[in-house]
Design a protein with these regions (language model features):
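Thiamine diphosphate
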Residues: 21-189
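Conserved thiamine diphosphate
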Residues: 1-22, 171, 176-177
Length: 189
C-alpha cells in the first residue's frame, strides 16, 4: 500500500496522478478537510516522496507531513529569528517511508516529529522504531494526538495538542534546554 499526505492542492493534484498512474497496487491519498492553506514563500511542490530543507547545522531536525507543514515551517522561521536554525523534513509519501528519510534523520542529534494524527501506531512512532533499529544515538520525540479531542475548530484542536506554531516552538526550545550547550557542527553540503 502506498499512502500520500499532500500539504496543499498542488501536491494533492501531483499525488492523485501518482496514485492513479504510477503506483502498482493500492494507493491512498490523505488530505484533511478544511480547504487549502497558503503555500509558504519559496516552497515548490515536487514529485519526490519528501522535501528536505537544510539549515546548515546538524543539531535539530523537525519532521512532519500534511497540513501542519505550514506550522512547522513558520516555527522554523521563528526559531531562526531566535538564533536557533533548524532543518525541516516534510514527508509527502508516508508509506512506504523512503529509506533516505531515515538516513537524513540519523545525522541529527535532536529529531522532533510533529504529526496531526494518533501517536500510537502513527508515522512518527514508525520512524522512531526505524531509527532505533539503526542504533540512532540522539534524542527523538513525537508530538501527536494522545487522546480524543472534544469537538472544536481545527485551530483550537491544533493548539490543544501543541501542533500550532507556538506549541512547536515551545517543544523545540524545551528539547534544546535539556541539552548542555555544545558547538553545532556544520552540515556537509
Amino acid at each position: 500500500v502506498t499512502i500520500y499526505a499532500p500539504f496543499n492542492f498542488a501536491e494533492l493534484e501531483i499525488n492523485l496522478k501518482q496514485a492513479l498512474y504510477d503506483v502498482k497496487g493500492i494507493a491512498a491519498v490523505r488530505y484533511p478537510k478544511g480547504g487549502e492553506l497558503p503555500c509558504p514563500a519559496g516552497y515548490v511542490p515536487n514529485f519526490k516522496p519528501y522535501t528536505y530543507l537544510r539549515s546548515g547545522k546538524k543539531a535539530v531536525l523537525l519532521i512532519t507531513y500534511g497540513r501542519i507543514f505550514a506550522n512547522v515551517l513558520s516555527a522554523a522561521k521563528e526559531l531562526l529569528r531566535q538564533g536557533l536554525p533548524v532543518s525541516v523534513l516534510k514527508l509527502t509519501r508516508i508509506h512506504p517511508l523512503d529509506e533516505e528519510c531515515v538516513q537524513i534523520a540519523r545525522r541529527y542529534s535532536h529529531v522532533l516529529f510533529f504529526e496531526e494524527g494518533s501517536r500510537r501506531g502513527g508515522i512518527g512512532e514508525y520512524l522512531g522504531s526505524r531509527l532505533m533499529a539503526e542504533r540512532f544515538s540522539g534524542s527523538y520525540r513525537v508530538r501527536a494526538i494522545e487522546d480524543f479531542l472534544t469537538t472544536c475548530s481545527t485551530a483550537s484542536g491544533l493548539h490543544q495538542v501543541g501542533l500550532d506554531v507556538e506549541g512547536i516552538v515551545a517543544a523545540v526550545l524545551a528539547e534544546r534546554s535539556s541539552d548542555a550547550p555544545t558547538e553545532e557542527p556544520d552540515e556537509p553540503a
